[in-house]
């Protein structure tokens, strides 16, 4: 039996947690997630032309539907571009889940100049998020997604 990839586990976890729409911008580090989204008809994917738009679209979706909005962006400059929308959602107590890719594990925190590498991606978001997590292996995905959703539904998002 083939082993489930992290991308497949992520998409199935999002469906299980009730995510119906994902706003995002495809990129090399997250193409596996887009492939998994393509294979699962349970989530609608709306692509945009800038990561900031993805975050603002997730925010608007959350505010207009009362559901959690989800955005999918590339690491490094992608998550930094999304940070304005993330900060707006956080300041407004709007529930959005932002999923960012990451560079290859063998390049992580090595400062080698890998495409979209940022030494501490999570640190960039600490002042505009309630919860952040880093997932390194496929088995961690369901629990991490569940905890993120729990955080969004408990207290201030």
Please provide the spans of the model-predicted regions.
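N-terminal alpha/beta PP-like core and its mobile active-site loop of ThDP/TPP-dependent enzymes
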Residues: 1-157
């Amino acid at each position: 039996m083939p082993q489930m990839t992290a991308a497949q586990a992520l998409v199935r976890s999002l469906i299980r947690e009730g995510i119906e729409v994902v706003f995002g911008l495809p990129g090399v580090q997250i193409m596996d997630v887009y492939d998994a989204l393509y294979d699962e008809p349970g989530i609608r994917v709306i692509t945009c032309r800038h990561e900031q738009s993805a975050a603002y679209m997730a925010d608007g979706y959350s505010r207009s539907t009362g559901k959690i909005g989800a955005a999918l962006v590339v690491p490094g400059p992608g998550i930094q571009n999304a940070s304005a929308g993330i900060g707006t959602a956080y300041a407004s107590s709007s529930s959005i889940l932002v999923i960012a890719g990451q560079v290859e594990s063998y390049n992580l925190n090595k400062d080698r100049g890998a495409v979209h590498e940022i030494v501490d991606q999570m640190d960039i978001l600490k002042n505009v998020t309630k919860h952040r997590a880093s997932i390194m292996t496929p088995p961690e995905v369901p629990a991490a997604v569940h905890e993120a959703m729990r955080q969004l539904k408990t207290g201030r998002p």
